[in-house]
């Protein structure tokens, strides 16, 4: 029992005030919450937004060849109604359509017009070439009051073919055009549906009318349908415009006996452009690459929540209004000095959770105390290593989204040319895919950033531990108690990775021998106390048994066993 009293006295009497160096990381009082693959609302030191929500309410055209069609509808640049006379040939990389724009003058429609619009929006402008068609025995100057210039006129790029005189027979004719260029040609023709059978006879003579159009990959016959219809622009008749893309060295042939609106010129495309439908004004003083009906999106972010129908070099549209990308480490706000001890590598996460709000010069750093006082310094090497790996995360995220979604976008662009309005449904489906992938990509990057920051912290800890070796002891709070006097120069050598443990080894070993026997945690004290108590009890029992045995042997004690 005297042994127990001696140990307790030594523990209470001997006190160590060793020099100490601690490792920690930058922290802020209020961080930003992000989502990772495994957890939502993880607080980090800093983060950046990846979803653009702002737009410029103007069409920015600085540095671009932009064409504002105004009252001219996009399809009108092919046929040439009066409102489109100034746009029959042009070059542009941005085509702006307005709601007031009209494709026709004489009432009618374009067949498969959405596909044709898509082609023209991407055309880069057009130039034209005459078909070279000549006619005899008919009139080629049909006009209408619906298409007015100085007076009645017609589509500038079309010929309205009529009988030589009213009610006269229209002769059977065949006309052919061969595309001799090394690029596709766009050819448009019309079928006239008169307001009545009487009007059709007056214009084209009596009898059934038939128009046949054929090329190597196109064959179609048309029969006009005369009949009463509501008047539009003073006309009850209609013209249906049809079109085809004629490949190089291919020939298209038209056979007809009336009710045919013939092409006078064919169109060729000049390059690449994009088209937008918008009512906002044009601004030649600002630049842009991404447009929508409400203006221009100027952003380097990978995603946008402005408009799902934006065109050009645009961030990908997602449903989320915000997706924060972590650009800093996990935030652990600084705890007051009398804080609960945290485990180091014994903890589940293995992360040194020492957040220091005063560490502003770097992500990772040191605090020390010695005879000269206390100090704090950042570790620039580990900080730079982490920054180098995190810098460019936003650009890498943009690359991932472009590579992942561009193929889908191109695939559905082809579908749009074929089935027109079905693209509205497919785009909604694509938005769902983009939104899911955006969420996943940002969460993956955030997970990587946090894991990376943890890794750099642990690397720094291991670097210090390997330097100090047996000259110091870990205290399970991210600190090392040093068993020798370590002035500011010594502390600097630990931080700079130039510490020589052999220089201080002898002093450290001497101090370790003095400190170790009495530097016991409460758990070890309990073990020693119980061991000492057990040993004392065993010794007393052995003495008692020895006395009993001697008494029995000498006859001073008798033991009787009764059964």
From Swiss-Prot:
<dbReference type="Pfam" id="PF00509">
    <property type="entry name" value="Hemagglutinin"/>
</dbReference>
<keyword id="KW-0564">Palmitate</keyword>
<keyword id="KW-0946">Virion</keyword>
<keyword id="KW-0812">Transmembrane</keyword>
<feature type="signal peptide">
    <location>
        <begin position="1"/>
        <end position="18"/>
    </location>
</feature>
<dbReference type="GO" id="GO:0039654">
    <property type="term" value="P:fusion of virus membrane with host endosome membrane"/>
</dbReference>
<keyword id="KW-0325">Glycoprotein</keyword>
<keyword id="KW-1162">Viral penetration into host cytoplasm</keyword>
<dbReference type="GO" id="GO:0019031">
    <property type="term" value="C:viral envelope"/>
</dbReference>
<keyword id="KW-1167">Clathrin- and caveolin-independent endocytosis of virus by host</keyword>
<feature type="lipid moiety-binding region" description="S-palmitoyl cysteine; by host">
    <location>
        <position position="559"/>
    </location>
</feature>
<feature type="disulfide bond">
    <location>
        <begin position="290"/>
        <end position="314"/>
    </location>
</feature>
<keyword id="KW-0449">Lipoprotein</keyword>
<feature type="transmembrane region" description="Helical">
    <location>
        <begin position="527"/>
        <end position="547"/>
    </location>
</feature>
<comment type="similarity">
    <text>Belongs to the influenza viruses hemagglutinin family.</text>
</comment>
<keyword id="KW-1168">Fusion of virus membrane with host membrane</keyword>
<dbReference type="GO" id="GO:0016020">
    <property type="term" value="C:membrane"/>
</dbReference>
<feature type="disulfide bond" description="Interchain (between HA1 and HA2 chains)">
    <location>
        <begin position="22"/>
        <end position="479"/>
    </location>
</feature>
<keyword id="KW-1170">Fusion of virus membrane with host endosomal membrane</keyword>
<dbReference type="GO" id="GO:0055036">
    <property type="term" value="C:virion membrane"/>
</dbReference>
<comment type="function">
    <text>Binds to sialic acid-containing receptors on the cell surface, bringing about the attachment of the virus particle to the cell. This attachment induces virion internalization either through clathrin-dependent endocytosis or through clathrin- and caveolin-independent pathway. Plays a major role in the determination of host range restriction and virulence. Class I viral fusion protein. Responsible for penetration of the virus into the cell cytoplasm by mediating the fusion of the membrane of the endocytosed virus particle with the endosomal membrane.</text>
</comment>
<protein>
    <recommendedName>
        <fullName>Hemagglutinin</fullName>
    </recommendedName>
</protein>
<keyword id="KW-0261">Viral envelope protein</keyword>
<keyword id="KW-0472">Membrane</keyword>
<keyword id="KW-1032">Host cell membrane</keyword>
<keyword id="KW-1160">Virus entry into host cell</keyword>
<dbReference type="GO" id="GO:0019062">
    <property type="term" value="P:virion attachment to host cell"/>
</dbReference>
<feature type="topological domain" description="Cytoplasmic">
    <location>
        <begin position="548"/>
        <end position="563"/>
    </location>
</feature>
<keyword id="KW-1015">Disulfide bond</keyword>
<feature type="disulfide bond">
    <location>
        <begin position="72"/>
        <end position="84"/>
    </location>
</feature>
<dbReference type="InterPro" id="IPR013828">
    <property type="entry name" value="Hemagglutn_HA1_a/b_dom_sf"/>
</dbReference>
<keyword id="KW-0732">Signal</keyword>
<keyword id="KW-1133">Transmembrane helix</keyword>
<feature type="disulfide bond">
    <location>
        <begin position="486"/>
        <end position="490"/>
    </location>
</feature>
<feature type="glycosylation site" description="N-linked (GlcNAc...) asparagine; by host">
    <location>
        <position position="424"/>
    </location>
</feature>
<dbReference type="InterPro" id="IPR001364">
    <property type="entry name" value="Hemagglutn_influenz_A/B"/>
</dbReference>
<keyword id="KW-1165">Clathrin-mediated endocytosis of virus by host</keyword>
<feature type="disulfide bond">
    <location>
        <begin position="60"/>
        <end position="286"/>
    </location>
</feature>
<feature type="glycosylation site" description="N-linked (GlcNAc...) asparagine; by host">
    <location>
        <position position="30"/>
    </location>
</feature>
<keyword id="KW-1043">Host membrane</keyword>
<feature type="topological domain" description="Extracellular">
    <location>
        <begin position="19"/>
        <end position="526"/>
    </location>
</feature>
<dbReference type="InterPro" id="IPR000149">
    <property type="entry name" value="Hemagglutn_influenz_A"/>
</dbReference>
